[in-house]
Amino acid sequence: MQQVKKVVLAYSGGVDTSVCIPYLKKEYGVSEVVTFVADLGQGEDLELIRQKALNSGASQSIVGNLVNSFVERYAFPAIRANALYLDKYPLSTALARPLIAENLVNIAREISADAVAHGCTGKGNDQVRFDLAINALGPDLKIITPAREWNMSREEAIEYGEKFGIPAPVSKKSPYSIDVNLLGRSIEAGILEDPMKEAPEDIFAMTSSIENSPDSPQEVEIIFKNGFPVGINDESLTPVEIIKKANVLAGEHGFGRIDMIEDRVVGIKSREIYETPGLLLLIKAHKELESITLNPDVVDFKGIVEKKWGQLVYQGFWFGPLKDSLDSFISSTQTAVNGRVKIRLHKGNAIVIGRMSENNSLYREDLATYSEEDVFNHSLAEGFIYMWGMSNKIWAELNSKTKD
């Protein structure tokens, strides 16, 4: 097997990726480890993380600002797709992985690296997402996965890193595994591994508890153009600004917490806690606007597409041909999704209280009203019902005779 000399490592500054640096050098004989730190709006001191990579033995550490790309190319398409895995999880973490993988491959090309590496364990979903994306974009590149191969527990990984002078970012008494980006936070491990234990309040950072959220409700209007959110409360905003503002508005009122049992790609069930206030709010508003601007059969079929889209992204097939085809269908439905949705935020709830589309609404008050302005032709109903139920009536008559 050809000796790997230069590796690009996806680096977060956490236990697993920090330990990967000396491990790659010692166990694989790698001479150069170049780390890539993705800025996804997580709010961390990325320069400090970059320096930690260098102190841990990296020959070079690159920080990439991916925030705009993350929102425009990944989060916004997910909003158009009303993406909710298992009808709950808006893929806040899953959406980030193909973007990071794309940049790993690009950097590997630029610096003529032999391989790319990541610190995902063998039990999680992210290993699948990284590997599938890297194989799709750089099928010639070798993928090295130290954390999947060394089979160390978190405690053992911390001890291994300490031998090489690598400080652990979490103590052995604080076992939570937390992933953060602009779209939200995911929390797992520790006490959360017991599905009957309530998630402690101190694990949440983006959302208020019901007790601490405002007693007075707040109404917000979200504006859409071609299925993309473009403003909040009559204020035009950039995509990143929209996510940030939606996070603050929804999070303040305690909306956006998810506590679920999740079906992982590797075949096990896991208990996951998510905070995704802004993304959930925007998806809820978008779905509501579609109800007034899309035909019933389009809404119905798009629901099937949305479920499959969410599954594909969750399972790591962002760069797959089926996902591309579903993107084309979803995009074709969104030219009519223009308008605004009014939502009341209060004590963990986001309640739709209004929706309108000036030029694309399929709702006609003169047809729906029961007042004297009603223009619906009631006399046509009897014939319609007769034809609509014809097959069922014939079936009933036949089966009635059979029983006799």
Swiss-Prot record:
Homotetramer. One of its GO terms (cellular component) is cytoplasm. GO terms for molecular function: argininosuccinate synthase activity; ATP binding. Pathway: Amino-acid biosynthesis; L-arginine biosynthesis; L-arginine from L-ornithine and carbamoyl phosphate: step 2/3. L-aspartate binds at residues 121, 125-126. Belongs to the argininosuccinate synthase family. Type 1 subfamily. ATP binds at residues 10-18, 38, 119. This is Argininosuccinate synthase. Its EC number is 6.3.4.5. HAMAP family: Arg_succ_synth_type1. The lineage of its organism: Bacteria, Bacillati, Cyanobacteriota, Cyanophyceae, Synechococcales. It catalyses: L-citrulline + L-aspartate + ATP = 2-(N(omega)-L-arginino)succinate + AMP + diphosphate + H(+). The gene is argG. GO terms for biological process: argininosuccinate metabolic process; L-arginine biosynthetic process; urea cycle. Pfam families: Arginosuc_syn_C, Arginosuc_synth.
